[in-house]
């Protein structure tokens, strides 16, 4: 074995999450087509108060060192007047808060500077097309694209790291090479390519076929030679990374061996023409987290979920500590056991490094342990099974 294609968590994800996402509010003036939260213009009266939000952050810090990543999302977090104070308090606790704002008029250079001064480590911005017309249509308002690009520049000038999020749907597949070029040219610490989960307003958007998803995953892997990129709710990207490393070591044609389609070939051709692909090893995918396995989501009203895209409440931070819910809630414990998976995911040799999107499985079937709907891989079909052994971890014993 000459390289490790995957990063491994340096913590016991049964004891502490890698990332905690807090939905600070659902208030947001935009009307994005894919919005998980189905955001509303006004704040909900049952949102966590400032005092309760501080207590939540103390609970996050109680997971110990290294502290989980702590992301404040929405709606639009700028709808909360206590946002800067909460970021500052999180920093005092030893957290490194990141903020995921919407591209509203509140996203000004002054507010971005205040976020940095309060102690925010990074922000994430959404770019779902490479042109103003296409992006603004997706977001529901004119001017959002130009405001996003201006905020991108202002955030970097203020000293904030910037992550760019892109939701992949049938509407913007052809835009992916151009969005990648924006990420390269403007600079970002990470490009997060999110595979749509049909929740909230996103239920109305057309799903990718498994073949299209596979083509996009391999295209994203190719971009990793130039652009720092990861996937969200596309856990089979880790399978792709293992397959591609083994095929590269054998000098095999990955497109032919894996039956990649015309979408992949078109995206790759356009990206190569733009200088977005080089003949060198791609960056490894970030640490694997999945719903309830390294990831926990706290809603605006305090309910705790394995993911923001898996709407099954497992407790409430107003009633039980977050540490207790994450470690002991039956669904969280079950989600950390690959042996609970069914269908092709349950039979797959990659299940311990992938596991499929539990959120998408639930959204499409009502069964959180069902097979990943956007994965077309047939277990056992990879032709070099013997070479897989060093890359696939031994599965942990089931949590009792």
Where are these regions (language model features)?
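Structural preference for beta-strand elements that scaffold enzyme active sites
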Residues: 19-21, 69-71, 96-98, 122-124, ...
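Short cysteine/histidine-rich zinc-coordinating motifs and their immediately flanking basic loops
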Residues: 44-48, 357-369, 386-390
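Accessory C-terminal segments flanking Radical SAM cores
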Residues: 236-380
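Structural motif corresponding to alpha-helix initiation and N-cap regions
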Residues: 50, 80, 106-109, 132, ...
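Radical SAM enzyme [4Fe-4S]-AdoMet core and its adjacent flexible, acidic
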Residues: 43-44, 116-118, 126-128, 133-290
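Short Fe-S-cluster ligation motifs
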Residues: 59-74, 372-400
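Conserved alpha-helical substructure of the radical SAM core
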Residues: 1-118
